[in-house]
Amino acid sequence: MFSPDGGLPAAPFGLLPDGGPPFPRGGYDGAAAQQLFFPFASEPDGARDAATARAWLPPPAGPPAKAEARPARPCRQGSPEPRAAPPATPCCGPAWAAPPWPGPAPPAATAVPGPPFPGPAAAAFPAAPGHALCPAALQPSSGGLANLGSSGSSSGAASEGGHSSDSGDEDAPTSEELEQFAKDLKHKRIMLGFTQADVGLALGTLYGKMFSQTTICRFEALQLSFKNMCKLKPLLQRWLNEAENTDNMQEMCNAEQVLAQARKRKRRTSIETNVKGTLESFFRKCVKPSPQEISQIAEDLNLDKDVVRVWFCNRRQKGKRLLLPFGNESEGVMYDMNQSLVPPGLPIPVTSQGYSLAPSPPVYMPPFHKAEMFPPPLQPGISMNNSSH
């Protein structure tokens, strides 16, 4: 039953001894102790390799240094207790099951800290405490997608079929309608005898918004943007209706055109001849009078100061154009326009009375550039003919 040394009784090879007391509970009748462990699966003797050792699973050593990417596994709700194998004979070694302590969880099975999506969908997929959230729970239900799709399609259909909030009461015209209206406008405008400028002035007279001839021309040529043509079409349509039903539209356009030209151009100032002579005498005395002198001249001649000032400006420009400047330094001397341009350093040929002299030899001068501040000194003339004196 037990060894004389007082130790535990010997156990067969590959079996652990019983964890109970060394003496059986039934007494000292020498009955064999009952096996308290779960039975293990058996393997045939020929299939067991004695050289292959079954090692224990290592204890958990904290989180792994580098997590390996593993494919997602289906969620299983299993029991943490080891499963029991069918009864087997005690002649072979045990096949160790999973250890009772929990091992490190794979990275793909970690629980999400918050709900995957807010709203009622999160309440439809509650995460059980202590278990990882299954990947299937992260996918929205087909009913939710169908609802979203149906709502989006219904809203799109409503926006296409109905009117938008900022579209206005009437629909925007299409490109074909704008093109046809531009053709009709041009044809009726020519038939009624209006120009493009008349149309722009009439729009300003009737509706307070004037347009240029270029704008009307671009509208008829379809060269404006679609948005601008849509804005301009109602005004032109109203003008066209007024022009067809009103007889004095041409007179109204002509009056507006006259007023516009009067606003743009000032009346031309006319100065009498005797006043011009007086101004000319003042100009010979002083080319550029001061503001005080201009005021005095205007008061003497009963003219406006701006008229006198503009006359002096125009007179100075006229003198520059005709090269007839009058000033203190010129003292009324006019320049001779027919005087030959001869450099002052060269001798001027003198014609003798009664007989002719030989022509002077040609003189070649070095080129003088405009960028130079001082001209180069004159070189002595080189005669091209051998004239004896």
UniProtKB/Swiss-Prot annotation:
What is this protein's record name? POU domain, class 5, transcription factor 3
Which conditions up-regulate this protein?
Strongly down-regulated during embryonic stem cell differentiation induced either by retinoic acid treatment, or by cell adhesion prevention leading to embryoid body formation.
Q: Which family does it belong to?
A: Belongs to the POU transcription factor family.
- Determine if Cell membrane is one of this entry's keywords: no
Which BP terms does GO give this entry?
positive regulation of stem cell population maintenance; regulation of transcription by RNA polymerase II
Q: Which CDD domains match?
A: homeodomain
Q: Which UniProt keywords apply?
A: Activator, DNA-binding, Homeobox, Nucleus, Transcription, Transcription regulation
Alphabetized SUPFAM superfamilies for the sequence: Homeodomain-like, lambda repressor-like DNA-binding domains
What GO molecular function annotations does the UniProt record carry, in alphabetical order?
A: DNA-binding transcription factor activity, RNA polymerase II-specific; RNA polymerase II cis-regulatory region sequence-specific DNA binding; sequence-specific DNA binding
Q: Where in the cell is it found?
A: Nucleus
Q: Which residues bind DNA?
A: 264-323
Stretches assigned to the POU-specific domain: 170-244
InterPro entries assigned to the protein according to its UniProt record, in alphabetical order: HD (IPR001356), Homeobox_CS (IPR017970), Homeodomain-like_sf (IPR009057), Lambda_DNA-bd_dom_sf (IPR010982), POU (IPR013847), POU_dom (IPR000327), POU_domain_TF (IPR050255)
Question: Can you name the source organism?
Answer: Gallus gallus
Domain of life of the organism encoding this protein: Eukaryota
Q: Which PANTHER family match?
A: POU DOMAIN, POU DOMAIN, CLASS 3, TRANSCRIPTION FACTOR 3
Q: Which SMART domains match?
A: HOX, POU
Upper lineage: Eukaryota, Metazoa, Chordata, Craniata, Vertebrata
Q: Which Pfam families match?
A: Homeodomain, Pou
Q: Name one GO cellular component term.
A: nucleoplasm
The entry's function note states: Required for the maintenance of pluripotency and self-renewal of embryonic stem cells. Transcriptional activator that binds the DNA consensus sequence 5'-ATGCAAAT-3'.
* UniProt feature, compositional bias: Acidic residues: 167-177
Composition-biased stretches (Low complexity)? 1-18, 145-165
